[in-house]
């Protein structure tokens, strides 16, 4: 594969993946394209269908998963999340590097495909900092917060598995984390720019 490789971003909720991704798309919008995931959860305030997620019913999503339309899917807190093949193809059709934001289960599923992306794990400096960030969102109940923190602890342990990720970024400072992300993707950015994009 001579063109730029897709990028898989993973990490616990509240680690800063979305913020890093927004910065990357603001600076390099003509090079990167975000693969919009599907979910059965309700939209949060300010989220747009087709931009942040495709918000669908469980019935629709289960039907499409059964039909083999998804690269990866997972269930978390009673909601389904997943990346459709069509969403990735839509980004690639624009000659952009496809960025996928998936959980650890999704990473393991993608490892079984022929996608060959760069795998990057974004983690908070500590679980205490993560808890603080999640509480500031005001979107979690105590029960869902406890679930997210337990999942984060497990993800941060699993991320150490040899060969699972190409890079682990500790997001203790947004600027430093963003610099590390850009540095890791510099080769792919050059490849994409070499195909006549700016």
From Swiss-Prot:
Expression tissues: Expressed in retina.
Domain Guanylate kinase-like: 4-186
Assigned keywords, A-Z: Acetylation, ATP-binding, Cytoplasm, Kinase, Nucleotide-binding, Transferase
Primary residence: other
Record: residues binding ATP: 14-19, 171-172
Pfam families on file: Guanylate_kin (PF00625)
Family: Belongs to the guanylate kinase family.
The protein's name: Guanylate kinase
Originating species: Bos taurus
